[in-house]
Amino acid sequence: TRCAYCSFVSQSVERTLGLVEPYLEVLHREITDAARMVQEAGLHIKSFYMGGGTPTTLSADQMDRLLTHLNRSFDLSGCAEYCIEAGRPDTIDREKLQVLLDHGVDRISVNPQSLEDHVLTAIGRRHTARDVEEAMALATGMGFPHVNMDLIAGLPEDTPEGFRRTLDKCLSYGADNITVHTLSLKKGSRILLENFTIPSAEAVGEMLDYANAALRQADFRPYYLYRQKYMSGSFENTGWCISGAEGLYNIYIMEELHSILSLGAGGSTKMVDPVHQRIERVFHTKYPTEYIQRSEKLEENLSAFRQFHENMRG
């Protein structure tokens, strides 16, 4: 499902179940080709991040096959961080989390956005606050070194009091990263298309002020910040963590000193030449059907990535 605030490319696994295996087959081939290119270009992987969407909509077997192929294809010996978005708690179970641990994943994200059940219903989430609590107990109990939780200030039907309850619960669950987003009124989202009623800028400001005070009181510190277009109240998104739990991938994105090679439908590859302060991007086709059918686009993007880095070396 796609949440009411989201305008990202997404496909319902339930409605497109027949595409999953063909999609994974093409993704496996792209991983093979990308790993060969990275090795031949003499590049090294510092951080791995699998996002979406919600990768944990895959079955445990599908995830196991995907990560097995990934780990065999790429040299991850110098990779300091292995992160996967577990995302919605209704996609998380012990079997899937064990697969992630078995393959060396050391950072996951469980993203409730809110822990007020009426807010979750308003934004189209299928899970409850209780589901989040159970997913977090499972993740922390199984020993994941780092767990992030995403929250959004300014969601429909939310209030400063409800946001406070949500944040206090997140702090009690043992997450060492909490990312506080401000609602972005994105074109194409249901919130805009269907004229949802959202909290005022003043109310959102109260939510963020509370987050700032409560997180600092809990020994969290902000380590990255960014703004998006159309944000409620012109506020920002802030990543908070306890000391030593910083997410490297987030830092690399903000610094814009590292290239990011993206694989899969909807991916955006960023090529960075820090010496000459030059950045170029190439984009994958957006939808799974296009991704499966247009193998030449995958080849073009990998070729562009290789050429960019060859040119950097002169």
Where are the language model's segments positioned?
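Radical SAM enzyme core and accessory elements
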Residues: 3-4, 27, 243-314
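A broadly tuned preference for mixed-charge, low-complexity surface segments
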Residues: 45, 99-107, 139, 228-237, ...
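Flexible glycine/acidic-rich beta-alpha junction loops that bind and position SAM and/or redox cofactors
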Residues: 4, 118, 122-123, 153-160, ...
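Conserved N-terminal phosphate-binding loop of PLP-dependent enzymes in the Aspartate aminotransferase
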Residues: 216
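Conserved non-cysteine loop/helix-boundary elements of the Radical SAM core domain that shape
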Residues: 10-211
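Local cysteine-cluster metal-coordination motifs and their immediate loop/turn environment
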Residues: 1-10
